[in-house]
Regions:
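Extreme N-terminal starter segment of soluble prokaryotic enzymes
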Residues: 1-4, 85, 256-257
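Structured adenosyl-cofactor binding patch, chiefly the S-adenosyl-L-methionine
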Residues: 122, 126-173
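SAM-dependent methyltransferases
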Residues: 1, 188-255
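N-terminal nucleotide/polyanion-binding subdomain common to many enzyme families
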Residues: 1-77, 207-221, 225-228
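S-adenosyl-L-methionine/SAH cofactor-binding core of RNA-modifying enzymes
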Residues: 63-118, 161
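Internal, active-site/partner-interface "lid" segment
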Residues: 147, 159-199
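A short beta-loop-alpha structural element at the N-terminal edge
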Residues: 257-271
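Conserved GNAT-fold acetyl-CoA-binding loop/helix
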Residues: 270, 274-293
Length: 293
C-alpha cells in the first residue's frame, strides 16, 4: 500500500507516521508512505501557496497551481494503475470517515493521495479537476487536514497484511462488525481495589466468549445508531432482550444481613411464638410464618 500526503508540514507528518507499528511496517517494506511539501511547487520566489479569496471574506485560500504541481510530482513515479489510485481531499464538507470506509479503501485501491488543506481551504477548481472524493473525520473544523490524513493513513494501513501480527488484531475491535469492543484488562489482578472479573481468570474459554459477547452488546447499547446500521442477529436480539430485562430489575443497595440471635432478641422471639400459637388455634392449621419485627 502506498500513501502520498500533500502537506505544508511534511516533517511533522513523517515524525508521527514513522513511529511504532507504521514505522516498523515501512522499514519492512509493507508500506510506502511519502510526504510532499506543497510549498516546493510554487512558481513564485516567496514560496507563497495561498491568496485572498475572491468576493472578500476572512482568511486565505490555497492556490490551485502549487497543489496541482505537487500532485503531478507525487504521481509521476507511480506504477499503480489509474483505477487503483484515489485522490482524497480532507475536508469538513465530506462524508464522515468510518471503519467501513477504511475497509473499502483498503480493498479497492493500492495508492491513496491525501491532500491536506489549510487556512480557509483550497481553490474549488483544484477539487473539481483533481480530487476523486472528499472525506471528513467528524463534524468539527481543524486548522488543517494533517490530523485527518494521519487518521485515514493509520486506519487503512493497519489492515495491510503483515502490518499487524494477525487479522484478529483488528477484526475483533470496535466498529469492525458494527459493535463496540468488550472491556480489556491486564496485570496486576487487583489495582486500587478494583479486581479483574473472575470469568476472565477462570480459563473457561466458552464462558469468556459469552462474557465478551454480552459486554460488547452492552457497550453498543450506548450507540443505538450502530444497531440501525448493522441490525442484531437473532442470537444477539435474544441476548439484548435479556440485558434489558436484567437492567429493569431493581437492584439491592445492600445485601440481606443474617446474624445469630442474642438475649436482646428474646422478647421479639416470644412475641412471634405467641403469634404462631394464636394463629394455629384460630385457623386450625399446622403451619405458620411469623414476621420478625
Amino acid at each position: 500500500m502506498r500513501i502520498d500526503i500533500l502537506t505544508l508540514f511534511p516533517d511533522t507528518m513523517r515524525a508521527m507516521l514513522g513511529e511504532s507499528i507504521l514505522g516498523r511496517a515501512q522499514a519492512r517494506g509493507l508500506l510506502d508512505i511519502r510526504c510532499h511539501q506543497i510549498r516546493d511547487y510554487t512558481e513564485n520566489r516567496q514560496k507563497q501557496v495561498d491568496d485572498y479569496p475572491y468576493g472578500g471574506g476572512w482568511g486565505q485560500v490555497m492556490m490551485a497551481q502549487p497543489l496541482k504541481s505537487c500532485l503531478d510530482a507525487a504521481l509521476a513515479d507511480s506504477t499503480v494503475p489509474v483505477e487503483r489510485r484515489r485522490v482524497i481531499y480532507l475536508s469538513p464538507q465530506g462524508p464522515t470517515f468510518t471503519q467501513a470506509k477504511a475497509r473499502q479503501l483498503k480493498a479497492d485501491y493500492d495508492q491513496l493521495v491525501l491532500v491536506c488543506g489549510h487556512y480557509e481551504g483550497v481553490d474549488e477548481r483544484f477539487i473539481e479537476a483533481c480530487v476523486d472524493e472528499e472525506l471528513s473525520i467528524g463534524d468539527f473544523v481543524l486548522t488543517g487536514g494533517e490530523l485527518g490524513a494521519m487518521v485515514v493513513t493509520d486506519c487503512v494501513c493497519r489492515m495491510v497484511p503483515g502490518v499487524l501480527s494477525d487479522t484478529e488484531c483488528y477484526t475483533g475491535e470496535s466498529h469492525w462488525a458494527g459493535r463496540l469492543e468488550y472491556p480489556q484488562y491486564t496485570r496486576p489482578e487487583t489495582w486500587e481495589g478494583r479486581t479483574v472479573p473472575e470469568v476472565l481468570r477462570g480459563g473457561n474459554h466458552a464462558e469468556i466468549e459469552a462474557w465478551r459477547t454480552r459486554q460488547s452488546l452492552e457497550r453498543t447499547l450506548k450507540r443505538p445508531d450502530l444497531f440501525q446500521e448493522t441490525p442484531p442477529t437473532p442470537d444477539e436480539q435474544r441476548l439484548l432482550d435479556k440485558i434489558r430485562r436484567d437492567r429493569s430489575r431493581p437492584q439491592l443497595t445492600e445485601p440481606p444481613i443474617c446474624r445469630a440471635a442474642t438475649e436482646d432478641d428474646l422478647p421479639a422471639i416470644l412475641a412471634i411464638a405467641q403469634q404462631a400459637r394464636n394463629y394455629l388455634r384460630r385457623h386450625r392449621v399446622d403451619q405458620w410464618q411469623g414476621v420478625y419485627p
